Structures are given as C-alpha cells and as structure tokens.
Amino acid sequence: MGVKVGADVPFSIMMNACLNADELKGLPQLVEASCAAIVSGIGEVVDAVMPRPYFVILFNPGIAVSTKEVYEAIDRKLEGAELAQREADVNRFYNELELYTLTNYREVQNLVSRIREHLHADEVLMSGSGPTVAAYYTEETRFEADCEALESARWVEPTWRYWKTKSGGLNLWS
C-alpha cells in the first residue's frame, strides 16, 4: 500500500519501525524492521539487511534534481529490455540512478569528483536520484581527520552543505 503514496514509502515505513521498535513492541513482523535495506523495483521491494558500521559525511550541492526526470530517463533506457538479474551483494556500493544524474547535473558530478580527490573515504555514492552524496568511512580516525579538514577546505563551494553521521543510528551533527 505504501508504494501507492510514493516509491520511498515502503523503506521509510520499515526504517521508522526499526527506529521506534521500543514503542512498537508486540507488533507482528517487527523483527523484519531494519535501519538498512536493499531496495529494488520502484522502491516497493525492500529487503532488510544488517546495517554496516560506517562513519558517513553527507554532502548536498545546493541544487535540486528532479526524481521524476531521473526515473523517466532510466525507464526509457530500459524500455524493451529486461534488467539483468543481480544477486544482492551488501558488500558492494551501487546506485543505478547515479550515472544519469552525474552525466546530466554537473554540480553533482563536480561534488563527487572533489570528494574523491580531497577526502579519504572508503566509498563515495550518490543517495537515491541525488543530489545528496555520501562519503563512507570504516575508520573513525580518517573520518574525523576529513571532518576537521572540511572546516577550512577551499575546495568546498559556498552553496554546499554537509552533515556527519554514523550508519545505523541517529547520531547526526553538523
């Protein structure tokens, strides 16, 4: 039912059930709730996975990306062809929508390029259809060093915003 409201609703419902587990004790299938998932289809297929312990810096370049435009472009690309079946691999960072957005939104492409050039993240991946980009770290020392370097970084554009967080939790600060 949630997908009829919006493609991201099924994941949001699952994630919020996880985050509010104490208040929702006793509900059937709450055990399936997770703060992390592999999402496919148009967002209606949500397979819960255990969250990986990452330190994360989220970046937003201060522009809007049309989710509708990105999905329509992907739909046109796939029209008449079937998606290759991929085995879910939770060790791999991948976003089917990233190529279109990076190709058509120079600001996002510039952001990703600069993050990869100047920071020491293990992985850099766009979130959803964009424009937010996440830099993932397995080591807190590298994460903290990059966070500190960001405070005076000349490569950061004035319109960009960033937030520091940890995966699987609500420890958000900026």
Predicted regions and their residues:
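ATP-dependent small-molecule kinase catalytic core of the GHMP/sugar-kinase superfamily
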Residues: M1-E123, Y136-S174
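Conserved glycine-rich beta-strand-loop-beta hairpin in the small C-terminal domain of fold type I
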Residues: P131-V133
